[in-house]
């Protein structure tokens, strides 16, 4: 059993209506009736029109509302309405995002996805509490986040078609071959990986990003860096010399990004390093259900195949919050505790998949992976990651934090020109670039 609603539709629907809100007081907005009609078409045609809209705070890409109403059957229901941020199409392929949301919901990994309208989408409300920064330091919650991250990284998803979600242990070889990127849930360290005794540097990376293999070039990190750098350079090309942006040497950070991608290609190009990732594991994208003892992820707009070290390293960066207080960056002890529980989760999912594969029962594989009663504590009795395994992934994740700093730095530059959300994107970008400079040598010298 899983907490999300059963999917009862063949695929996501689309309504050709555009919603424009100048403020968060939807009830007084002239588009209110349009939004009611969208809810009727996508969610419940017989819903009662006494609808409550509650703004969800904290978003820096989109505007979110929780909509509560009474269904035609007389029951209470809540959904999330997301209005796409102005200019966010520069970062996000909305068609791919809708397909990912549909496939994740169909497999029980995400909430029910009802469909899209011209500048937004609607999906189910996940019961629980949105995590706050301070929650990340609680051992039980950190373990649950690690468990859910491991479960995500065990999935195989064809994000370029409307095919069903595929588990990495599928016994059908033809199904395996249909996926866009082949991944592995192996927790062993590749012989080509960076050894803890090695101190790599970007200067030693000689591969050209243009010649990178298809698997690494298709990762979210590489695609985003290549695209966002070009967008940022174009947008800033006409800035006056006295502006704040003109003081950022984007050409240098572009070169840093090229060198970093070559470095990652050299050390982390094996398929064991690439999984289906959330890519935006910030506290407000995690819902904690205390009663069920679960943490579930929401908001999948940046999700896609990526380096596992990026997903983990980016999560560590998010301990610093939107104000980027890096004194809150997790200690080595906290990082390794998270990594240990992550490896346990990955191994547990892999073992379940292998056992069910032997029985040739694909449905049982899916149900087992989605079993909400699978707990970290019991898994520890079955598998104990080695210190070397934990340490190697610790180094890998910290190497990939460099990609996080650069990627979100360029994101901030673009958002400055396009977003209507009240947030200091330039200050955010400057701080991410500065942190890259500050930690680069230290991170690359990890042994």
Swiss-Prot record:
One Pfam family, short name please?
A: Choline_kinase
Low complexity: compositionally biased ranges: 178-208
Q: Which reaction does it catalyse?
A: ethanolamine + ATP = phosphoethanolamine + ADP + H(+)
Q: Where in the cell is it found?
A: Cytoplasm
Gene3D superfamilies, per database record:
3.90.1200.10, Phosphorylase Kinase, domain 1
Give Gene Ontology CC terms.
Answer: cytoplasm
As recorded in UniProt, its EC number(s) are 2.7.1.82
The UniProt keywords, alphabetically, are: ATP-binding, Cytoplasm, Kinase, Lipid biosynthesis, Lipid metabolism, Nucleotide-binding, Phospholipid biosynthesis, Phospholipid metabolism, Transferase
Q: In which pathway does it act?
A: Phospholipid metabolism; phosphatidylethanolamine biosynthesis; phosphatidylethanolamine from ethanolamine: step 1/3
Q: Is Heme a UniProt keyword of this protein?
A: no
Q: Which GO terms describe its molecular function?
A: ATP binding; ethanolamine kinase activity
What InterPro entries would the database entry show?
Kinase-like_dom_sf (IPR011009)
GO biological process terms held by the UniProt record: phosphatidylethanolamine biosynthetic process
Q: Where is this region: Disordered?
A: 178-217
In which family does this protein belong, per the annotation? Answer: Belongs to the choline/ethanolamine kinase family.
Q: What does this protein do?
A: Highly specific for ethanolamine phosphorylation. May be a rate-controlling step in phosphatidylethanolamine biosynthesis.
Q: What is the protein's name according to its record? A: Probable ethanolamine kinase B
Organism of origin is Dictyostelium discoideum (Social amoeba)
The root-end lineage is: Eukaryota, Amoebozoa, Evosea, Eumycetozoa, Dictyostelia
Name the gene: etnkB
């Amino acid at each position: 059993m899983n907490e999300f609603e059963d999917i009862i539709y063949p695929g996501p629907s689309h309504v050709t209506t555009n919603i424009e809100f100048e403020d968060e007081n939807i009830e007084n907005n002239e588009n209110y009736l349009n939004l009611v009609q969208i809810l009727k078409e996508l969610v419940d045609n017989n819903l009662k029109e006494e609808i409550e809209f509650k703004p969800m705070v904290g978003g820096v890409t989109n505007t979110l509302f929780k909509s509560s109403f009474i269904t035609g059957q007389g029951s209470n229901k809540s959904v999330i309405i997301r209005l796409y941020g102005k200019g966010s199409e520069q970062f996000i392929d909305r068609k791919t995002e809708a397909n990912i949301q549909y496939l994740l919901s169909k497999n029980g990994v995400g909430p029910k996805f009802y469909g899209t309208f011209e500048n937004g989408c609607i999906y189910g409300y996940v019961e629980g509490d949105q995590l706050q920064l301070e929650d990340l330091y609680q051992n039980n919650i950190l373990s649950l986040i690690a468990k859910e991250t491991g479960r995500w990284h065990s999935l195989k998803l064809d994000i370029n078609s409307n095919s069903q979600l595929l588990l990495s242990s599928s016994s059908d070889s033809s199904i395996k071959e249909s996926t866009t990127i082949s991944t592995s849930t192996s927790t062993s360290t590749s012989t080509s990986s960076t050894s803890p005794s090695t101190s790599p540097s970007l200067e030693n990376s000689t591969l050209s990003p243009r010649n990178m293999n298809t698997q690494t070039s298709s990762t979210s990190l590489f695609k985003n860096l290549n695209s966002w750098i070009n967008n940022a350079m174009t947008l800033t090309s006409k800035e006056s010399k006295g502006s704040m942006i003109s003081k950022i040497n984007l050409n240098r950070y572009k070169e840093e990004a090229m060198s970093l991608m070559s470095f990652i290609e050299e050390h982390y190009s094996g398929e064991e390093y690439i999984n289906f990732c959330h890519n935006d594991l910030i506290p407000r994208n995690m819902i904690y259900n205390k009663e069920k003892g679960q943490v579930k992820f929401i908001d999948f707009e940046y999700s896609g195949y990526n380096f596992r070290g990026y997903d983990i390293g980016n999560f560590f960066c998010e301990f610093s919050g939107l104000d980027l207080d890096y004194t809150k960056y997790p200690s080595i002890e906290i990082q390794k505790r998270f990594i240990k529980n992550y490896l346990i989760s990955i191994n547990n999912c892999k073992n379940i998949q292998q056992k069910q594969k032997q029985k040739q029962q694909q449905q049982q594989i899916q149900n087992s992976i989605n079993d909400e009663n699978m707990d970290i504590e019991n898994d520890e009795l079955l598998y104990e990651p080695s210190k070397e395994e934990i340490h190697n992934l610790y180094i890998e994740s910290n190497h990939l934090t460099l990609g996080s700093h650069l990627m979100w730095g360029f994101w901030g530059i673009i958002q400055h020109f396009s977003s209507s959300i009240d947030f200091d994107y330039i200050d955010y970008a400057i701080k991410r670039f500065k942190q890259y400079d500050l930690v680069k040598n230290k991170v690359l010298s990890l042994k």
